[in-house]
A protein has these predicted regions:
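Short, Lys/Arg-enriched N-terminal segments with co-localized hydrophobic residues
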Residues: 5-23
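Acidic/aromatic-lined carbohydrate-recognition and catalytic surfaces
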Residues: 24-187
């Protein structure tokens, strides 16, 4: 159940959000903040290419603040081949080109902080894209230093190691001819 924090109970509904809400610094923000998730691809397009972007998000921060938003939960914006809506990250240190640049991100973050809005990044660390440099390296040989970053198994009776299924259907195991082994891909 959500809670409404009001300084003036009888007039709270008639006042703008910023006048009746307890300031963020008085809250345990991770428990009491109003969080708004943004899927950047469809949120706000700043350059007319039909794809939402970081500059588009920045342009709407004041409006989100007026709505009473304390925290933005930002869906993945990292570099990705985008086979899984950005959850297949190929570079954790860069922004997907269609969303902008690292400079655009820094500007959006600075503006959010200026307005007292926190940003929580959706950081996917339990899997990466098959185009991530670590995975590309792990495929090169069985003794590659990156090999243990991923789950590799020998074939069982000439087939997948087990009957596990991928979240999107089909086997969770993909055969890799280079080392004659299967790697696990749940997505």
């Amino acid at each position: 159940m959500s809670q409404v924090y009001s300084r003036k109970v009888n007039s709270a509904c008639a006042k703008p959000a910023q006048e009746w809400r307890i300031p963020m610094e008085e809250k345990k923000w991770w428990k009491e903040a109003v969080v708004y998730q943004i899927y950047p691809h469809s949120f706000m397009d700043s350059n007319g290419d039909g794809v939402g972007d970081l500059r588009g998000i920045k342009s709407r921060l004041s409006y989100l603040k007026l709505l009473g938003i304390d925290v933005i939960w930002l869906s993945p914006v990292y570099q990705s081949p985008n086979d899984d809506n950005g959850y297949d990250i190929s570079d954790y240190r860069d922004i997907m080109t269609e969303f902008g640049t690292l400079e655009d991100f820094d500007e959006m973050l600075a503006e959010a902080h200026k307005l007292g809005i926190k940003i929580v990044m959706d950081l996917v660390v339990n899997h990466s894209s098959d185009e991530h440099r670590w995975f590309v390296e792990s495929r090169k040989s069985k003794d590659n230093p990156y090999r243990d970053y991923y789950i590799w198994r020998e074939a069982k009776d000439g087939k997948e190691p087990n009957n596990w299924g991928s979240c999107f259907g089909g086997s969770a195991w993909e055969y890799d001819q280079t080392t004659d082994m299967y790697y696990l891909h749940m997505f």
